[in-house]
């Protein structure tokens, strides 16, 4: 046949750059020369020669086959299938033809046809390792792990030095949790070719899965040494350093990734996590935003960014981020929880309560999910039905939302409450509740049920309809053996540490560590000689009194508390409670006693934003942290407020300025145990609506107004 001399070349336009005459060569010589061009990447010359062979010998199977293979390399799959299929028709017993046809069909996603081609290849040559390997790849992509592993086993049996088969066998074994066998497969691949970075990387993944961290680090480093731009290996190595707390080392590795590719979303996210942990919130926000712009497909970056935006009080932006996350994954419960926390924080109660129902799918709250035989109450009138209200999450949540028992009570409905054993005697003081059952004991018959924190949604609570009449809880018994009788001083209860062991924590809502304060930070308050402080702590934080040598400043009451009724008995004898955001703060507010609550910058949704009073507890005053981790200003403000109270005239202070409705009734000559329902119902709103009563306690003028009101009401 005639063709160009192999010294000739064509430019990009296909024009000849040589005037030399063509030479006569055989078909086989032309085919060999085409294969050489093909293998060296000179594809244009290879195509030209394959084509000329077919011009001379139209049914030449090898030329058809190789031209089809070359076409498939450039994505011309249909043409490739036609050429290779025609080659098979002309020479059906060539196993490599069937194997390469299978490869093209696989590339097109025609898995079943591809498997048939590979099987036809193996029918001709059962020991063709490449066909077993390719068949395993199809099985693996279809999720048929057992068949894939079997195919890879046959591939390495046919060719023990087939590196790819060893690696893929390791992958399938890892997917089957056969980790030791996977390690052996990867190590065999490395033994054949130590420079295959993928084998080292996969080996590192298995070591990490087995918590063999040092081996994983070594394997990842080996992969990186052989492939310095191996982004996956760098990311995993950075992750290990981050988890181990080597944040500087992790940052260095992540930055190496970004120097290779600046838009790796996972790396940007990981850098955001590091900055977040180090308190560099601005940098963390920047990295999270860049990760989202890079198109990350996971929602955890949105969750973290939403949390930080909420912490910076950029609530509208946080809502947008959470909604964006729901576009990616509408069923991510943590995103719904994050959205709920922001909506509730800014007062969007209707949507916020709806989103909060996703808590039952949240990993942190799954232990609190309950299954009941009877239906979930839908908020419709109860009539004479029996409803089971069950507490969920922490003590504070139960105390706050048990108020709704009074809201749904009527003359016919029977209310049963199931709660933590520590709350039973306390909740039994509510007249609206027929029976209180400790959690874990058998339940009586009931018609419908509802968790306490679903009641605001069911009852359509908004900012203007929060049931905030206090007290709605009272001491279990009128008499107590605990007597705090020191009329010479202002008696102040103190709680400085949140107990994360007893109350559920959800990082999307708030964390106990940020709510707690070192007892030492209160030291300046202990210098007030007019005050006697009593510890209401019941956990290990009580030892702080001894550690900081405050035994002469603080009387430890918590050691004698077994239930919240014990705590209640103490609180009722105190003039004031100062507490971080704990169950004691809720309890004090529910008892209608004065409570000063100390809040971190990122406070829980129930305290809203920029308020110094509580919509839930009229007798509560909020002291807000201005800077994360810095409680100095908060303590200073408490000191100023204490000074004002003392200067108002202790110890007679609470004879003329009182917080409790019970005390108000006593001052105007009405027994708290006997005053009429209309007095309780109408007097509380009267005082709470008093625009001059900004400090949330009754003055002499308030008492005079109350007396005049009661007199007019009774005379009418």
Give, region by region, the residue ranges found by the protein language model:
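Major-groove DNA-recognition helix of helix-turn-helix-type DNA-binding domains
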Residues: 668-696
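Ser/Thr-centric signal marking residues that sit
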Residues: 582, 674, 699
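Short, solvent-exposed alpha-helical surface patches in well-structured domains
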Residues: 426, 524, 666-667, 705-708
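Alpha-helical solenoid repeat scaffolds of the TPR/TPR-like class and their adjacent stem/linker regions
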Residues: 1-576, 581-649
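Short, well-ordered alpha-helical scaffold segment located
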Residues: 454, 674, 702-705
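Helix-turn-helix/winged-helix DNA-binding modules
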Residues: 514, 656-657, 695
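A short, Lys/Arg-enriched interface patch at domain edges and termini
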Residues: 641, 700-716
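Polyanion-binding surface elements
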Residues: 651-677, 712
């Amino acid at each position: 046949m005639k063709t160009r001399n192999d010294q000739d070349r064509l430019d990009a336009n296909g024009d000849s750059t040589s005037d030399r005459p063509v030479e006569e060569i055989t078909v086989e010589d032309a085919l060999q020369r085409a294969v050489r061009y093909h293998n060296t990447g000179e594809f244009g010359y290879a195509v030209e020669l394959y084509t000329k062979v077919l011009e001379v010998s139209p049914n030449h199977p090898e030329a058809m086959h190789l031209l089809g293979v070359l076409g498939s390399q450039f994505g011309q799959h249909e043409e490739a299938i036609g050429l290779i299929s025609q080659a098979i028709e002309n020479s059906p017993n060539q196993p490599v033809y069937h194997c390469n046809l299978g490869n093209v069909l696989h590339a097109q996603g025609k898995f079943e046809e591809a498997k048939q081609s590979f099987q036809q290849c193996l029918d001709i040559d059962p020991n063709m390792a490449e066909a077993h390997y390719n068949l395993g790849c199809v099985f693996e992509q279809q999720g048929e792990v057992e068949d894939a592993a079997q195919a890879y086993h046959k591939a390495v049996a046919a060719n023990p030095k087939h590196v790819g088969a060893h690696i893929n066998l390791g992958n399938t074994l890892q997917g089957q949790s056969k980790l030791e066998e996977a390690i052996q497969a990867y190590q065999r691949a490395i033994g054949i070719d130590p420079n295959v970075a993928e084998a080292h990387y996969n080996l590192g993944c298995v070591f990490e899965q087995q918590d063999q961290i040092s081996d994983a680090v070594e394997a990842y480093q080996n992969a990186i040494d052989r492939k310095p731009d191996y982004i996956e290996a760098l990311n995993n190595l950075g992750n290990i350093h981050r988890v181990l707390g080597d944040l500087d080392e992790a940052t260095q590795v992540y930055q190496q990734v970004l120097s290779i590719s600046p838009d790796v979303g996972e790396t940007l996210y990981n850098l955001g996590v590091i900055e977040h942990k180090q308190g560099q919130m601005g940098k963390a926000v920047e990295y999270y935003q860049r990760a989202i712009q890079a198109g990350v497909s996971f929602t955890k970056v949105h969750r973290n960014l939403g949390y930080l935006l909420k912490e910076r009080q950029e609530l509208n932006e946080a809502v947008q981020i959470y909604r964006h996350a729901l576009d990616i994954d509408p069923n991510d419960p943590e995103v719904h929880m994050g959205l709920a926390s922001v909506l509730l924080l800014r007062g969007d109660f209707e949507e916020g309560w709806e989103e909060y129902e996703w808590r039952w799918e949240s990993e942190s709250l799954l232990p609190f999910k309950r299954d009941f035989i009877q239906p979930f109450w839908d908020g419709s009138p109860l009539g004479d039905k029996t409803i089971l209200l069950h507490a969920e999450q922490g003590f504070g949540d139960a105390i706050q939302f048990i108020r709704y028992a009074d809201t749904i009570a009527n003359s016919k409905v029977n209310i049963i409450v199931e709660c933590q054993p520590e709350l039973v005697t306390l909740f039994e003081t509510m007249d609206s509740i027929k029976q209180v059952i400790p959690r874990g004991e058998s339940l009586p018959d009931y018609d419908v049920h509802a968790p306490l924190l679903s009641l605001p949604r069911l009852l359509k609570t908004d900012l203007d309809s929060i049931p905030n009449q206090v007290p709605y809880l009272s001491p279990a018994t009128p008499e107590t053996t605990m007597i705090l009788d020191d009329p010479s001083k202002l008696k102040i209860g103190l709680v400085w540490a949140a107990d994360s062991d007893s109350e559920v924590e959800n990082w999307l809502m708030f964390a106990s560590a940020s709510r707690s304060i070192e007892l030492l930070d209160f030291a300046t308050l202990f210098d007030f000689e007019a005050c006697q402080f009593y510890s209401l702590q019941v956990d290990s934080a009580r030892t702080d009194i001894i550690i900081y040598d405050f035994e002469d400043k603080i009387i430890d009451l918590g050691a004698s508390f077994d239930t919240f009724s014990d705590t209640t008995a103490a609180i009722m004898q105190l003039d004031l409670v100062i507490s971080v955001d704990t169950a004691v703060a809720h309890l004090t507010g529910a008892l209608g006693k004065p409570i000063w609550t100390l809040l971190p910058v990122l406070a829980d949704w129930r305290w809203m934003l920029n308020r110094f009073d509580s919509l839930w507890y009229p007798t509560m005053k909020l002291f807000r942290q201005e800077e994360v981790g810095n409680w100095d200003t908060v303590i200073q403000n408490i000191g100023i407020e204490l000074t004002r109270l003392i200067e108002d005239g202790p110890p007679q202070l609470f004879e003329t300025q009182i917080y409790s409705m019970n005390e108000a009734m006593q001052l105007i000559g009405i027994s708290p145990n006997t005053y009429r329902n209309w007095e309780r119902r109408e007097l509380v709103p009267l005082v709470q609506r008093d625009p001059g009563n900004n400090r949330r306690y009754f003055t002499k003028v308030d008492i005079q107004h109350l007396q005049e009101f009661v007199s007019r009401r009774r005379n009418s």
